Each structure stands twice: as structure tokens, then as C-alpha cells.
From Swiss-Prot:
Zinc finger (SP-RING-type): 357-440
Organism: Oryza sativa subsp. japonica (Rice)
Family to which the UniProt record says this protein belongs: Belongs to the PIAS family.
Region feature (Disordered): 88-114, 617-650, 753-775
GO biological process, one term: protein sumoylation
Top-level EC class: transferase
Zinc finger (PHD-type): 122-179
Signal peptide: none
UniProtKB keywords: Metal-binding, Nucleus, Transferase, Ubl conjugation pathway, Zinc, Zinc-finger
Cysteines paired by S-S bonds: none
Pathway: Protein modification; protein sumoylation
Gene: SIZ2
Residues annotated as domain SAP: 18-52
InterPro entries attached to this UniProt entry: SAP_dom, SAP_dom_sf, SIZ1/2_SP-RING, Zinc_finger_PHD-type_CS, Znf_FYVE_PHD, Znf_MIZ, Znf_PHD, Znf_RING/FYVE/PHD
Protein name stated in the entry: E3 SUMO-protein ligase SIZ2
Length: 813
């Protein structure tokens, strides 16, 4: 026989609560019971009551609950009771009629399992009133659903103003604040719930009157036995509501505490001194002063501010336990976010910044030096920790930081000095990878260089095992890349066509050097070549020309193949990589071969025609130039022992190079060519001497009409190799022993070149290093002056210095 609902107090209590439920709460109960949630409100109530009345079989049509899914009445009653408590905001917030039904039956409230305060309430305010009103604020704690009255917990700095206080961007309740203030204590129980301490009143003399706060709390046997363990303590704490540092303890001015009549020291600072931003107060431990049963605490203070006081049973944590609360490296922050922060800090702005922005920050250095030492201990960082809200990239040693805060309780960033809590600490994924790699180095290695792109290297010597090289942000070795294009100078084989000289046009030679699409210099090839010319000697990248010298000149001592002389000659050979200095000459006809030196891609070239240049020893204005002495301009190959200084010894490598010499004009081609019996007397060089080891930076070959309009006031590219006496009566040339083998090239220089050349035109006849430099010439040769010829077969082997050389000398057959 079913029990009448009037005789079942549990059913009557649940029915009373169900009548106050909304549809939302009814559906929540049905959802937990696994029952259908469709229907009107009364239908939902009937489904729940049917489960409580033990009539599931008769009412299966109504509730649709199978027998195998039946639940007990105690379970249903607990679900209904919990839902009712959440709806009203507190488990104790039940109206007075809750304990008495409409029929007059008394319902005994359910006793709590212990004396601890219930923390899983929705409304809990220090004022003691647990009903919600129109102005509520919710705690941001992840496991806290507490709501509090705004007027009780948000205190205005100027209470006299009628303007309501501004809500903070982040709000934490008093319990969450005290938990984060010192993570080395974990709250177990609250014998005294947080209670508000009102400000003191102002006395007649303007001072604040001393006020007292008394609170009696029970201590159960279970809690008393818990406090007998070493890791548990009873602590009294106090916080300021509108504290600028939310996660810390702070006591009022002139605070004194008595526990069961025993006075206890509260703070170590002066009673009249307020706590600064960097200061921290501690909570006195009451374990030695309490007893099982009732205990009384009395607080006296004299302060105009509003505080909150409470008593808790807390358990101590070790350093390892606190470190375990810090998220792992992969859980704290994404590596890309850490890299973006480093790039922003090192680069001086975001990636969106450009040259048109108004930012005053400019990157001056290629890299920034970063110290890997902890700012608190001075030792090298082992685990790079940081506070997540910080915008800087500075880090600290995580283990050392946590260990130091066990006493100081100052969870403050040592770089920017902003206050946070343990919940904000993460492991920096960027710097933690670097510190892990640096652990194998000595203690003196503590700095790295960081580029704006995030790549890094350790500053130190070669003992760093590769860490001194640049690494990518993820720690991998960075491959060396050089974006700057280096000139790739190569010797390009060229075939030059020799055309027969005539009185009308003369013979022209074209050597085209231009820059290709890849930015490299190259020599244009010609298909119609004649390889039966004088030869070059090529040793890898070294190419020089051999001057025409016969046996007779060798006997007379004109040719000097001494080893010291050859070493000096090979060191003074220069290449042909030059650019034009004077581009005001008209382009020459393109039907014949000319010499071209240009860094332009245009096809218009400047030419120098033998017929257009005055080959006479005397110029139009009477100036004369000495010819180039017939001696070896450079030796870059090894000459066999016992070989005489014959010209054929310099022509062995000609077929490989395929670069013919300049063909000299005959005496019939240029009427101005004169021959004398003077033996290569070198005097009055009209040159501007440069150091023989300097490269030639500007070369231009230009030609004019046959009338030779190049005067002294024009800027010529080549210096002449002929000279005359000061009065212009006697001309001098260099005779090489062959009646018809002459090479004379007269090129007019500028007036400045003439002046400078005459100042430096003292006779240079030093036999040890007889050299002559031609400033701005196409062919810069190192010529040894005439000296004594050593006997044949006594020539020593010479070491060849490899250089990028392209030297062209003219000689005759």
C-alpha cells in the first residue's frame, strides 16, 4: 500500500520545493534523473513526484522510466534539494516555512557532515547577507561561482561621493585572493568565514577611535586532530578590499590580536606605517593558542579603511609542489607567440610597422645582446620562467624565483616590477630551448646575440661546440647564406680576328667585355678567329702576355730573367676589370675589330684605331713620348731550366687560352713611326704612378679621326710609350733587334697627366725592381728595366702567385 504523501515528510518537502521550481530547474532535475524533459510545467512536476511516490510501475505511462532505470527516493530528494539551494543562492537560505509543510508536518533540516563552511554557494558576501540584489559582481576564479554585493566589496576611494564606484576589469573574491596571495598554503577549511571589518570612526580630536572586532568559532575534534600534524596550521588572515596589490595580506594600522585572551604580534612594521606597494604582511599562526571546542578571537585596530578578516586551516606546500602547479612548457604558451614577442622586442616594433609609420624606434644594430642570468640571483637561468601578461621578453630562473618567494611572498616580476600571482607564471618556450642548450657550457657563458628575425648565437669562444654559430629560433643550426652577389671573374676564351692593315683603315682589334644578365663580367666570343698569333701563358686564373725579345737583346742585357726580378714582375700584374672614365668619345665604326672596355649593356662601344692614333714620336704641339721598353711585362708560368730567354718560351700555352696579342702596325702603316739606334733609354715617363698593388679603377679607350684631334687638354685613357727631347728635336724609340718589328702606340693624355708625369719622370733605372705604372691604362704591365742577363741554364724555379689577371701586350712577329 502506497504511503499517503501527507504521511511522508520527504515527499512533502520535495513537493513543496518542486512547486517553487521554474521550468528550467525542473528540466535540470529530469536531466539528472534520465527522464524525458518534454511537457508542461505540471507534467514535469508529476514525473518527479511519481519517482518519489514508489509508483513507477503504475505511472510508467506518465514518466516513461523503465524499471531498470529506477532510482531511489533519497537520490531524487538530494537532487531536488541541491537544485533548490542553487536557485535561492545558499543551502541555508530556505524560508522559515521550509521546515513546516502546509499540513503542519515538521521537516528536520539535513545536518552537515562537518563544521566547515560551505564554499560551493552562489552568493556569499562578507556582509553576512546571502541574498542577491540588483548589484552583484562575480568572481573570476576558474573554480569559484561566488557572487558578492558590489557595495560590500568594491569600496570607493572617496566615500563621500554619491557616484557609484567603478568596477575593476578583473575581480576576485576574498577567498580567491587569499589563496593566490601565498600558494605555499592551501586552504583546507574555514572555521571563520570572511567577514567585513568596517572603518573606524573619527574622534572629536580628529583621530580615529580604536574599534574592536570579536568572533567566536568552534573547533571540532576532527579539525583539532588535523592541526596536530606538522603540515597543518590554523592561520588568521586579513586583506584590504580596494588594495592596489590584490594578492597579498594587509593588516590595519595599530592592529592587535588576542586569541583566547593571549596577545599575538600581527605585523613587523611600525603600527602607524602603511604597507607600501612592494611590502607584504604575514598571517599569524594560531595553532599553539587554540583548543578543541569554542575559541575567541579579538582584533583591535584604528584605520579608516575597510578590511576583510578570516580564519582558515591550511596545509603547507613544498617548493616542488608549488613548481608542479606551473604549466608545462607546451601548455603555457605557444612557441609562435613567444617568437613574435622576441621579434617585436628586438626589432623595435610589430611586423606591420613600415617606413611610413610615425614610430620613433629604429633598428641600428643587426643583433641585440641578451643576458641569460637571473635578475634575482645572478646565476645563469636553468628554466626560463616569466609572467604571461608581461610584454617584455625578460625571463628569470623559475626554481630560484619560487624558492625565494617562499619567504617573501612577493609574486612580482623582477623585470617590470608588476604584481601577479602564481597562476600567471609560465615557461618561456623560446628562451627555455636556448638555456637548455647552454647548460653544457661553462658558467662564464651567459650572453647571446639575437637578431630581429629571432635567430641567435652564444657569445663566446670556439669551445662552445657550435653554439657560437647562428641558430634558427627553434634551435637548429642556421645554414650560412650570403645574399650579396660576389663577382665571379672567369677567364673566357676569345678568338680575335686579325685583318690585314691598310693605309686607309689600318688594323683594329676588338676585345668586348660586358656584364651579362647575372651581373658577371664576360668576354664576348667571336667565331672568325685566327689562332696563329703570339701566345699567352695561363696558370689557372693567371694570364699574362710575353713581350717580344730576341737573342740579340738578351746578349746585350736588355732582358733580365733573374728570379728576384720575376717574383717582382709577377706581383705587379693587374687585371683588365675596369670601367670607363671618359665617355665623351664618339663611337667607332663597328665593321672592324676594336678594343672595348665597358660595364654598360649597350652595344655602342668606344674604339681605338691604330690609324686614328698618331704614331709619330713628336706630337702636333711638339711633345714627344718614349716608347714602351721591349721587356717582359709579366711571367706567370714556369720556364724550363736551360731555356733561353726567347720569345717562343712564352707562347707554349697560347692554344689553350686562344687569346691573340695586339698586332703591331708595320712601319708602312704609320708614317710617323721612327726608329733610332738608342737602346731603350727610359726617361721622362709621363704617368701618374699608383701603387703597383692597387687595382685600376677606371679605364677608357677612345679613338678619333685620322687627324688625331686628341690634344693635351683632353682626358686620354692611355699613356704613350714614346718620348722626345725637351726641345722636341730628337725622337727616341726602343729598338728590339728586328728591323721590321716595331710596336709604337702614342696616346695623348690630359694636361694634368703631363704635369704630374713630368714631376715624376725622373729616370727610373733600378735593376732590382724596375717597374713602370701606367695610370688609367688598359694594359698595366710590370716591366723590368734593362739589366745584366744571367748565363743560360742558371735560372731558378719560381713560385707563381695566382691572381685574376688579364694582361695584353702588343708585339710583332
Amino acid at each position: 500500500m502506497a504511503l499517503d504523501p501527507a504521511d511522508d515528510p520527504l515527499l512533502a518537502d520535495c513537493k513543496y520545493k518542486l512547486n517553487h521550481f521554474r521550468i528550467k530547474e525542473l528540466k535540470d532535475v529530469l536531466h539528472q534523473l534520465g527522464l524525458p524533459k518534454q511537457g508542461r510545467k505540471q507534467e514535469l512536476v508529476d514525473k518527479i513526484i511519481a519517482v518519489l511516490s514508489d509508483q513507477q510501475e503504475q505511472d510508467s505511462r506518465l514518466n516513461g522510466l523503465p524499471n531498470k532505470k529506477m532510482v531511489g527516493k533519497e537520490t531524487v530528494a538530494k537532487i531536488v534539494d541541491d537544485t533548490f539551494a542553487k536557485m535561492n543562492g545558499s543551502t541555508n537560505a530556505v524560508p522559515a516555512s521550509r521546515n513546516q509543510t502546509d499540513s503542519g508536518h515538521i521537516v528536520k533540516p539535513k545536518r552537515k557532515s562537518d563544521d566547515s563552511a560551505q564554499l560551493d554557494v552562489k552568493v556569499r558576501c562578507p556582509c553576512g547577507y546571502s541574498m542577491a540584489n540588483d548589484s552583484m559582481i562575480k568572481c573570476e576564479g576558474p573554480q569559484c561561482n561566488t557572487q558578492q554585493h558590489v557595495g560590500c566589496v568594491i569600496i570607493s576611494e572617496k566615500p563621500a561621493d554619491s557616484v557609484p564606484p567603478e568596477l575593476p576589469p578583473h575581480f576576485y573574491c576574498d577567498m580567491c585572493r587569499i589563496t593566490r596571495a601565498d600558494p605555499f598554503w592551501v586552504t583546507v577549511n574555514h572555521p571563520v568565514l570572511p567577514v567585513s571589518i568596517t572603518p573606524c570612526k573619527v574622534a572629536s580630536d580628529g583621530s580615529y577611535a580604536v574599534q574592536y572586532f570579536e568572533k567566536t568559532f568552534p573547533l571540532s575534534r576532527a579539525n583539532w586532530e588535523m592541526l596536530q600534524k606538522d603540515e597543518y596550521d590554523l592561520q588568521v588572515w586579513c586583506i584590504l578590499f580596494n588594495d592596489s596589490v590584490p594578492f597579498r595580506m594587509q593588516w590595519p594600522l595599530h592592529s592587535d590580536i588576542q586569541i583566547n585572551g593571549i596577545p599575538i604580534r600581527v605585523v613587523n612594521r611600525q603600527p602607524t606605517q602603511q604597507l607600501g606597494v612592494n611590502g607584504r604582511d604575514d598571517g599569524p599562526v594560531l595553532t599553539a593558542y587554540v583548543r578543541e571546542g569554542s575559541n575567541k578571537i579579538v582584533l583591535s585596530r584604528s584605520d579608516s579603511r575597510t578590511f576583510c578578516l578570516g580564519v582558515r586551516i591550511a596545509k603547507r606546500r613544498s617548493v616542488e609542489q608549488v613548481l608542479s602547479l606551473v604549466p608545462k612548457e607546451q601548455d603555457g604558451e605557444n612557441f609562435d607567440n613567444a617568437l613574435a614577442r622576441v621579434r617585436r622586442c628586438v626589432g623595435g616594433g610589430t611586423e606591420a610597422d613600415n617606413a611610413d609609420s610615425d614610430s620613433d624606434i629604429e633598428v641600428v644594430a643587426d643583433s641585440v645582446s641578451v643576458n641569460l642570468r637571473c635578475p634575482m640571483t645572478g646565476s645563469r637561468i636553468k628554466i626560463a620562467g616569466r609572467f604571461k601578461p608581461c610584454v617584455h621578453m625578460g625571463c628569470f630562473d623559475l626554481e630560484a624565483f619560487v624558492e625565494l618567494n617562499q619567504r617573501s611572498r612577493k609574486w612580482q616580476c623582477p623585470i617590470c616590477l608588476k604584481n601577479y600571482s602564481l597562476d600567471n607564471i609560465i615557461i618561456d618556450p623560446y628562451f627555455n630551448r636556448i638555456t637548455a642548450l647552454v647548460q653544457s657550457c661553462g658558467d662564464d657563458v651567459s650572453e647571446i646575440d639575437v637578431k630581429p628575425d629571432g635567430s641567435w648565437r652564444v657569445k663566446g669562444g670556439a669551445e662552445l661546440k657550435g653554439l657560437a654559430q647562428w641558430h634558427l629560433p627553434d634551435g637548429t643550426l642556421c645554414m650560412p647564406t650570403d645574399t650579396r652577389s660576389k663577382p665571379n671573374i672567369r677567364i673566357v676564351k676569345q678568338e680575335i680576328k686579325e685583318e690585314p692593315l691598310s693605309e686607309e683603315t689600318g688594323g683594329r682589334l676588338k676585345l668586348g667585355i660586358r656584364r651579362n644578365n647575372n651581373g658577371q663580367w664576360e668576354i664576348n666570343k667571336r667565331l672568325d678567329s685566327n689562332n696563329g698569333q703570339n701566345g699567352y701563358i695561363e696558370d689557372e686564373n693567371c694570364v699574362v702576355s710575353a713581350s717580344n725579345t730576341d737573342d740579340e737583346n738578351s746578349k746585350n742585357g736588355i732582358y733580365n730573367p733573374e728570379p728576384g726580378q720575376f717574383d717582382q714582375l709577377t706581383s705587379n700584374i693587374y687585371d683588365l676589370d675596369s670601367s670607363p672614365m671618359d665617355a665623351h668619345f664618339p663611337p667607332a665604326p663597328t665593321e672592324q675589330d676594336v678594343i672595348v672596355l665597358s660595364d654598360s649593356d649597350d652595344d655602342n662601344v668606344m674604339v681605338l684605331s691604330p690609324g686614328d692614333v698618331n704614331f709619330s714620336s713628336a706630337h702636333d704641339n711638339g711633345n714627344a713620348f718614349p716608347p714602351n721598353p721591349p721587356e717582359a711585362s709579366g711571367i706567370c708560368g714556369e720556364q724550363p731550366r736551360g731555356a733561353g730567354p726567347d720569345v717562343t718560351s712564352f707562347l707554349d700555352g697560347f692554344d689553350d687560352l686562344e687569346l691573340p696579342f695586339w698586332e703591331s702596325s708595320s712601319s708602312q702603316d704609320a708614317a710617323g713611326t721612327q726608329v733610332t739606334d738608342n737602346q731603350c733609354e727610359m726617361q721622362n715617363f709621363i704617368v701618374n704612378h699608383q701603387f703597383l698593388h692597387e687595382p685600376i679603377l677606371g679605364v677608357n679607350l677612345g679613338g678619333t679621326a685620322a687627324s688625331n684631334t686628341l690634344e693635351c687638354e683632353h682626358d686620354g685613357a692611355l699613356q704613350a710609350c714614346q718620348s722626345s727631347d725637351q726641345d722636341g728635336d730628337q725622337n727616341q724609340t726602343c729598338h728590339d733587334g728586328h728591323s721590321g718589328d716595331l710596336t709604337n702606340l702614342s696616346i695623348i693624355s690630359t694636361q694634368d697627366s703631363l704635369t704630374n708625369g713630368k714631376n715624376a719622370s725622373q729616370k727610373r733605372t733600378n735593376c732590382e725592381d724596375g717597374t713602370a705604372g701606367l695610370d688609367g691604362s688598359v694594359v698595366r704591365s710590370a716591366n723590368g728595366l734593362r739589366g745584366e742577363m744571367p748565363p743560360l741554364g742558371q735560372e731558378q724555379d719560381r713560385t707563381v702567385r695566382q691572381k685574376l689577371i688579364l694582361t695584353i701586350e702588343s708585339d710583332s712577329d
